[in-house]
Amino acid sequence: MSAHQVKLTPKDILEKEFKVSIRGYNQDEVDQFLDLIIKDYEAFQQEIDELRQENARLKRQVEELQKRPAMSAGTTNYDILQRLSNLEKHVFGRKLYE
């Protein structure tokens, strides 16, 4: 997977307690900022989950496409030439008999 593992979850951030000191930070301001961080974490986690699902789906699709027999250019060209020949016979063959 990735080299960096996420160490915090939104729940960890929400439940984090800070010691109060005489000249500490404004608790309401810290709480509001932590709420923003939690929302970002949740959004990032949701996006990561969606991207992982899409990645897995695309990998399955690639595997399925690789399993299908590849149509060679020679076979395709032969088919086109055969169709063209049949068409010429159909179109020009009628004119010969008219």
From Swiss-Prot:
GO terms for biological process: cell division; regulation of cell shape. The keyword Protease does not apply. Residues 34-71 form a coiled coil. Forms polymers through the coiled coil domains. Interacts with PBP1, MreC and EzrA. Pfam families: DivIVA. This is Cell cycle protein GpsB. The gene is gpsB. Keywords: Cell cycle, Cell division, Cell shape, Coiled coil, Cytoplasm.
